[in-house]
Amino acid sequence: MPTKIDKLSGTRWLARYNAINKIIEQWDVSKLHFKMATESERCYTAQQLYEMFADKRNYLYMVFLQKTLQELIIVNTAFQSDGANSLKLMEDLVNLLKNYLAILIPPIRLQQILNQELMSFCLSDYVMSGDFINFGYTFNEASVSVNKAELTNIKERCKTFLIELCVQIQCRLPTNIDILQKINFLSPANATAQVRRPDVTSLASSFRNNK
């Protein structure tokens, strides 16, 4: 019998990641459990749940969400910690956005984007077709038994989710992201480094150009 799934929170949607993990971990067990309940108890609810677990499309959505939310949860947890380095948090947010963009847009275009352009970058102009996006090995493996038309629709919906996620992250990036990253040159660790001390010339130039 499958274990109880974590209760979903209406306000903390990121907490749903734990529920998604548990659902995937016991997917086959849950499918078998509700199939047996359908046959032995003639339970309508059990039948509905069995059909949901038997549908490969639902499994694909869960696999996509699990992989997509994993990195987001890590960064979100860092933001909630006490005494976190604000510059490090900003770098984590930038890297998170870049990781999602790497899924959506061609690599050659991603390499051309400067950090200070990330907030205003219109990714919808460069997003690849869902059929050309790689959603990961587990997703690809699970998609084998899904027909082409349905798979195309699933990929497009996953792509739309990622686009909106990127847009929301963009809204949370600071406008002076380039200067903030250069300020990290002045951290105690960098300032007292015996080798490879950072060149602060670019930082000084940034303040001069912003006068």
What are these regions (language model features)?
Residues 1-211:
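Alpha-helical structural modules in large enzymes and assemblies
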